[in-house]
Amino acid sequence: MHLTPREFDKLVIHMLSDVALKRKNKGLKLNHPEAVAVLSAYVLDGAREGKTVEEVMDGARSVLKADDVMDGVPDLLPLIQVEAVFSDGSRLVSLHNPIT
């Protein structure tokens, strides 16, 4: 199987997101890279499912809460930007303060 660099990056994001969600389900708090992976995977999946940029941005606010992550992680993530391919083309999705 041959993957482009972009496809490889998406695969790594989804793998890390899966590991992070398993840890979250065990009651463990997520660290910075895990939180970024979960939010990024949410954006990529939302685009793939046919959601609009606005729907993805609104839904991302409910993915992780401050109780789900280690202390200080919400402060480290004032902005996450993910490029995703939507039905109308590639868009840069900006998540401002995604962890509430």
Swiss-Prot record:
Annotated localization: Cytoplasm
Catalytic reaction(s) noted: urea + 2 H2O + H(+) = hydrogencarbonate + 2 NH4(+)
Keywords: Cytoplasm, Hydrolase
Enzyme Commission identifier(s): 3.5.1.5
Primary subcellular site in the record, as a coarse category: cytoplasm
GO biological process, one term: urea catabolic process
GO-annotated cellular components: cytoplasm
InterPro entries in UniProt: Urease_gamma, Urease_gamma/gamma-beta_su, Urease_gamma_sf, Urease_subunit
Pathway the protein takes part in: Nitrogen metabolism; urea degradation; CO(2) and NH(3) from urea (urease route): step 1/1
Pfam families: Urease_gamma
GO molecular function: nickel cation binding; urease activity
Family: Belongs to the urease gamma subunit family.
Biological role stated in the UniProt entry: Disrupting the ure2 operon has no effect on urease activity or pathogen survival in BALB/c mice when administered orally.
Subunit relationships: Heterotrimer of UreA (gamma), UreB (beta) and UreC (alpha) subunits. Three heterotrimers associate to form the active enzyme.
Protein name in the entry: Urease subunit gamma 2
Native source organism of the sequence: Brucella abortus (strain 2308)
Chain's gene name: ureA2
